[in-house]
Regions:
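N-terminal Rossmann-like NAD(P)+-binding subdomain of aldehyde/semialdehyde dehydrogenases
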Residues: 1-115
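Short acidic-hydrophobic, aromatic-tinged amphipathic segments that line or gate anion-handling sites
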Residues: 2-8, 174-179, 301-306
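Flexible, glycine/charged-enriched surface loops at secondary-structure junctions
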Residues: 92-98, 220, 257-262, 282-294, ...
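Conserved small-residue-rich beta-alpha loop and adjacent elements
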Residues: 99-165
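Conserved NAD(P)+-binding/catalytic subdomain of aldehyde/semialdehyde dehydrogenases
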Residues: 169-258
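Short loop-to-beta-strand entry elements in the cores of soluble alpha/beta enzymes
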Residues: 203, 223-234, 250-273, 291-302, ...
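C-terminal core of ALDH-fold dehydrogenases
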Residues: 315-428
Length: 428
């Protein structure tokens, strides 16, 4: 086997984690002490926003009235597809059931949505409108009754109007002008008159991700997210221009967004390495600055001898987004095991999934695709078991449970069976 790195990144997604953790821990302690006032102070400090936190119904109606129809149509287009996909997931997800395990002993499970979901919608460098669709729509379809949304406000404006419109359209019950760690803390602790969130979902920067990590346990979370990632598997049949722009398309997210190419074609690799900087140079300032740093520090081009080598290294990376642009699409589709979301063929691209094609864009990063998938209706639903039984069935179950408990040395456990056997007229 011969795997050769034509470009190797000098940094990893975990770079600077220690500093981030220290900053986030201090912010969380500050909010725990100062509560809502602490959130407001941090909103003023980081976002330069000094207005109301809760977006009023009047404000939402004003935004709905003022937002241009084309934007509303596009949001509705995305919402419809994400809703349909979530409904299909729900229909094919586990079912409530009850089964008789032995004479008189019944057991089953119920699928029960969480009561309150907190959805974080980033709006720092970019206004991530689609994140509102992905999180709120999926929670709504899952049956969550109370959906909170927090999004970073702009000075004298509040949350981005299209994000407010989108969150409201998709079913948010409360929208807050609050971003960053303070938003995560507010939803977790039930501040500003809201119920505490049972689960937090949505992407965010490293500080948001670290806040979710620290608070996990007190509140459920969708996943431990890091900077967004893309990997592309391509062979000599791939279009170098499309491969290059797809890598750049994800690199523009931020300075630490990995972009990886796995290929068996040296010719394709050389063309992509040459073309990526040219495409980056053509971008506006903010995405150009982000993409330049991301490609320089986190971009990789890996040359392999065989398709099997490519599949193996891809599964080792377990990328968040994985595109396959090869002649042998079905082989890769069946062979690949570790990724957040798979984009099969040149016709589709990460941006489609990110924005409006229907699959969810809240996905595992930093190799977490080895053990989990992305956000789906099941993240908002608890699978809870139950049992019931007749008095007659206690004769066998009670006696067996008592004996097993005594084997383990747990006498009080055993006596909970003994007392029932005695009450119902059975000997042990």
């Amino acid at each position: 086997m011969a795997i050769k790195y034509l470009k190797k990144s000098p940094k990893t997604s975990s770079t600077d984690d220690t500093k981030t953790r220290e900053i986030v821990e201090n912010i969380l302690k500050d909010i725990e002490k100062k509560k809502e006032e602490g959130c407001k102070e941090l909103g003023k400090k980081f976002d330069k926003y000094d207005g109301e936190i809760i977006v009023s119904k009047e404000k939402i109606e004003q935004i709905k009235k003022n937002l241009d129809q084309k934007t509303k149509d596009d949001v509705q287009f995305s919402h419809e597809r994400v809703r349909k996909f979530a409904e299909a997931q729900l229909k094919n997800y586990g079912q409530d059931f009850e089964v008789e395990l032995s004479d008189g002993l019944y057991a089953g499970q119920k699928l029960i949505p969480v009561n309150t979901a907190g959805c974080y919608v980033p709006a720092g460098r970019y206004a991530h409108i689609a994140s509102a669709v992905m999180s709120v729509t999926t929670a709504k379809v899952a049956g969550v009754k109370n959906i909170l949304v927090c999004s970073s406000p702009k000075p004298n404006v509040g949350a981005h109007p299209t994000i407010v419109y989108t969150a409201d359209l998709c079913g948010a019950d409360v929208i807050m002008n609050l971003g960053g760690v303070q938003a995560i803390a507010a939803m977790t602790n039930g501040l500003f008159g809201n119920a505490p969130a049972d689960i937090l979902v949505g992407p965010g920067n490293q500080f948001v991700a670290e806040a979710k990590r620290i608070l996990f346990g007190k509140v459920g979370i969708d996943l431990f997210a890091g900077p967004t990632e893309i990997a592309i598997i391509a062979d000599e049949n791939a279009d170098a221009e499309i491969v290059a722009i797809d890598l750049v398309g994800q690199a523009e997210h931020g300075y630490n967004s990995p972009a990886w190419l796995f290929t068996t074609s040296k010719d394709l690799a050389d063309k992509v390495i040459k073309r990526v900087p040219e495409l980056i140079a053509e971008l506006p300032e903010l995405p150009r600055t982000n993409a330049e740093a991301a490609w320089r520090d986190y971009g990789e081009v890996v040359l392999c001898d065989t398709d099997e080598e490519i599949a193996s290294i891809s599964d080792d990376y377990a990328p968040e987004h994985l595109e396959v642009q090869t002649k042998n699409l079905e082989w890769f589709h069946n062979r690949l095991k570790n990724y957040g979301s798979l984009f099969v063929g040149e016709e589709t691209t990460v941006a489609y999934g990110d924005k409006c094609s229907g699959t969810n864009h809240i996905l595992p990063t930093k190799g977490a695709g080895r053990y989990t998938g992305g956000l789906f209706v099941g993240k908002f639903i608890k699978t809870l078991s139950f049992q019931r039984m007749t008095k007659k069935s206690t004769e066998l179950v009670g006696a067996a449970a008592a004996r097993l408990s005594r084997y383990e040395g747990m006498e009080a456990h055993a006596r909970t069976g003994d007392v029932r056997l005695k009450k119902y007229g059975f000997s042990n």
